[in-house]
From Swiss-Prot:
Chain's role: Catalyzes the reversible phosphorylation of UMP to UDP.
Protein name, entry field: Uridylate kinase
Binding site for UMP: G64, D85, T146, G147, N148, P149, F150, F151, T152, T153
Any one biological process term the GO annotation gives: UDP biosynthetic process
PANTHER family: URIDYLATE KINASE (PTHR42833), URIDYLATE KINASE PUMPKIN, CHLOROPLASTIC (PTHR42833:SF4)
Organism (species): Rubrobacter xylanophilus (strain DSM 9941 / JCM 11954 / NBRC 16129 / PRD-1)
Gene: pyrH
Binding site for ATP: K22, L23, S24, G25, G65, R69, N174, Y180, D183
InterPro entries: AceGlu_kinase-like_sf (IPR036393), Asp/Glu/Uridylate_kinase (IPR001048), Uridylate_kinase (IPR011817), Uridylate_kinase_bac (IPR015963)
Quaternary state and interactors: Homohexamer.
């Protein structure tokens, strides 16, 4: 069943009040793959604006792959993996500041919190302060992942979602409208999987998030929604309780 046919269906989660939105660095880069493309940045900003106008408490975790890909270039540069990971974390700070500037130009109060202390440009990550910002209607952008090497920003997003008691973790994808049984960009017969539980996600090795992030969500029962960030209105529809993309959660009561 296509996304348009499912658009009017109600999600079993219902309306969501507080969420963490995971944005990849690549979503800000456009077709070039690197750097920050103004048009791509504006797409994310428009979605966030709709979420804020809908009254949601929104936190964002942004990746840094458009700035620096530590895992890919560590060997080429002859540097340790831990150092490369710290360099990647700094890339997420660049993206977070770009998002903050773009949102505040549109009148959205925004705070950047970094797991690595960079007090000149971002607040340190403090859980209670982050929650207070959300309660006051500010968008909070979490930078630097977990602040530790060897952990992805997906894991950082899962961790922050649990820490701030989010209703769900929203995994934004580019031109992929959910979870597929195989890569739809390679296989023309790929089929979307609209609903699955954590064990299915982990056992089938579906390319949604890394294993550590999925295990964190599974252990605490945090719902995961995978959706296309480039389709206008998707984020707002999710927050309003519509079924969009694919849902990963506990086993449904009826199989």
């Amino acid at each position: 069943m296509g996304e348009s046919a499912r658009a009017a269906e109600t999600s079993e989660l219902g309306p969501l009040r507080r969420v963490v939105l995971k944005l990849s660095g690549e979503s800000l880069a456009g077709n070039g793959g690197y750097g920050i493309d103004p048009g791509s940045l504006e797409v994310s900003v428009e979605q966030v604006l709709e979420a804020v106008e809908a009254g949601a408490e929104l936190a964002i975790v942004v990746g840094g792959g458009n700035i620096f890909r530590g895992a890919q270039v560590a060997d080429e540069l002859g540097i340790e993996s831990a150092t490369a990971d710290y360099m990647s974390m700094l890339g997420t700070v660049i993206n977070a500041l770009a998002l903050q500037a773009a949102l505040e130009r549109r009148g959205v109060p925004t705070r950047v919190q970094s797991a690595i202390e960079i007090k000149e440009v971002a607040e340190p990550y403090i859980r209670r302060r982050a929650i207070r910002h959300l309660e006051k209607g500010r968008v909070v952008i979490f930078a630097s992942g977990t602040g530790n090497p060897f952990f992805t920003t997906d894991t950082g997003a899962a961790l922050r979602a649990l820490e701030i008691n989010a209703d769900a973790l929203l995994m934004a994808k580019n031109r992929v409208d959910g979870i597929y049984d195989k890569d739809p960009r390679v296989h023309g017969d790929a089929r979307i999987v609209p609903r699955l539980d954590y064990m299915e996600l982990l056992s089938r090795n579906l390319a949604v998030m890394d294993h550590t992030a999925a295990t964190l969500c599974s252990g605490e029962g945090l719902p995961i929604i995978v959706f296309d960030i480039l389709k206008s209105g998707n984020l707002r529809r999710i927050l309003q309780g519509e079924k969009v993309g694919s849902l990963v959660w506990r086993e449904p009561p009826e199989r």
